[in-house]
């Protein structure tokens, strides 16, 4: 049976289908429930920086990365063994399998581990740790140098589900031992901070009193699982909703919170709930992303939601796209915010960037190649490496045989890969790794994400497997100067 296409890739010249969300951990925010309590665990010692790392022996042979858009055949290769560094045979990067889900199932009957989403920054401030979620909704911290698990973020302050499900963990921008998180589904309208060494939780923002001055019956404040604060952690764009019951959370509006000054800086009333909201990396703009069927598509507002939008644009918002697609917001080389997304409605299915300062849209590359199409994820989280975004691709097929596996001889240059694309008028491409994504359900989509300096990446993959049960998480490493090599 052919793998299912569960993302948002339509056949050329047709409309996309929404992604399928299947497990409690993958369901849309308002539908997710807290996982059951888990036994207490003692915190391990902090990860030690500076020691040997998994890919030390391979990294000297990685450069240069394969540049350009020529079709490079992807050879068959066995799935890497657990925690054994492997060099990608076609693209030379270091690939390490950092989970052993099948062994976990055989010995512990525990949920599968997976990288949560491409828009979530999985790596902490110094890339010494990364974060995975299990399919029951608990979050796990791993040592990024060794790949070893460090701790499960449960039983915090005696509460088994304090940080669980849609708690939206965000790493602190400078302190590798801390992360922010929200109440599950934003219920309570607070922002918390966790110290990983002591497992102590502090409330850094109690937004409720100020939000209720605007919307008296608001109960929830969150991004709906797919947004991020600004790169420096100061500004947060969140949606406010009323909580009626498990099946009804009426929308009230969108707002910006200044965590440094602990105050509400702008609000916008809104009746229809967006797919998600996010602050731009600079903190200047709030991006509100609606599905076309339920709202006005994807728009950017300044953080005070005032008119004019900025000194160049007199309207009150910037229309970025007519729909909500797989996308992210990155820094370009000038440290301007760039919305990077795919336009399935365009004639060639273009991946594009839209400058949030200037309103300039630039095509990065087409995806409808020789009557094929595919799905993508975008990660713009390399804030310390401005001007690049990570793209992972999956679910490729031919328009004349949508339910069949695309034969290798029909594959196009982007298919089944992870690559960096530069955010330039004449974009460059650097292919990083083959990701072998046979996708069967939402949980095993790649959801590739990148660290702040574009040296480490995570992705999910069944590695050419026959079912979602083959899904594992892989870490990819490249040298710090990999994107600087001439094309």
Label each residue range with its predicted role:
Residues 111-120, 134-182:
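Blade-loop segments of beta-propeller domains
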Residues 62-77, 238-251, 291-297, 342-345, ...:
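Short, conserved, GDST-rich strand-edge loop motifs in beta-rich repeat architectures
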Residues 63-101:
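Blade/loop signatures of beta-propeller domains
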